[in-house]
Amino acid sequence: EQNALSPVVQRRVATVVLAQRIRAYAAMAQAHSRCLVRQGTLSASEAVQALNITLRDLGIDPVVLKNPLVEAVSPRFQGLLGANCGLDPKHEQEAQALLRNEL
């Protein structure tokens, strides 16, 4: 039970979980941006600029996109997107597994 953990350990666990979620968001957002480029909705430079702005607006440094885990998982997320560049519901479990096991 987390309540039994010391405050130091609780903070460390929270930090690890937050970092994982930030990487997950960045990887999925990057996959979405690349999908929009592939569809011709955005140019590559527009997609990069929009993604960087979105991340900064959330207080996330875009350098997270260079994280090896994000770089590895983002293309795999892209394969789970549907025609509208959103997560295809039939791939939701696979996406959750990527989040849990890869990031």
Please name every model-derived segment:
Residues E1-R12, E94-L103:
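Charged, low-complexity, intrinsically disordered terminal regions
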Residues N3-V63:
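Short N-proximal segments of mature Sec-exported proteins
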Residues A44-L103:
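Compact alpha-helical subdomains of small soluble proteins
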